Regions:
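Switch/communication elements of ASCE P-loop NTPase nucleotide-binding domains
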Residues: 1-120
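Conserved helicase/translocase motor-coupling segment
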Residues: 122-124
Length: 124
């Protein structure tokens, strides 16, 4: 009954802005944020704008897209609920888009996904 009342109050999408929700969280919990956001989106039609530097959170969105068969840039019921923008230094933001396998259609600039690999190679 409470859920029904809650849903009635939010018939229109509610947009919530989260700034670095991963701060001070263990990597496993950082990735779980994506599950929570997807559940809130599907259950209550909540929309989120999330500013993050968490590779774990972003990678989890890719996993969810692959598991659920979502895809960007298609007009269908299975359109991805996630939209990821990369904001390069001294340049304009751009959407990465998701393929059905969860991989991005565009690439991140240097210094994000490649940073951990670069540091590992320095140890060799």
């Amino acid at each position: 009954k409470n859920e029904r009342i809650f849903r009635l109050q939010f018939e229109k999408p509610l947009t919530i802005v989260l700034e670095e929700p991963e701060v001070h969280l263990h990597p496993k919990l950082q990735s779980a944020i994506a599950d929570i956001l997807l559940d809130a989106y599907k259950s209550f039609n909540f929309h989120f704008i999330v500013e993050t530097h968490s590779e774990y959170l972003i990678r989890k969105t890719q996993v969810l897209v692959a598991q659920m068969g979502f895809e960007s840039n298609v007009e269908s019921v299975e359109k991805s609920p996630f939209v990821t923008y990369y904001i390069p230094e001294n340049s304009k933001p751009y959407s990465l888009g998701y393929r059905k396998d969860g991989k991005f259609m565009e690439s991140f600039g240097t210094g994000f996904y490649d940073e951990a690999s670069n540091l590992a190679f320095e140890l060799l």
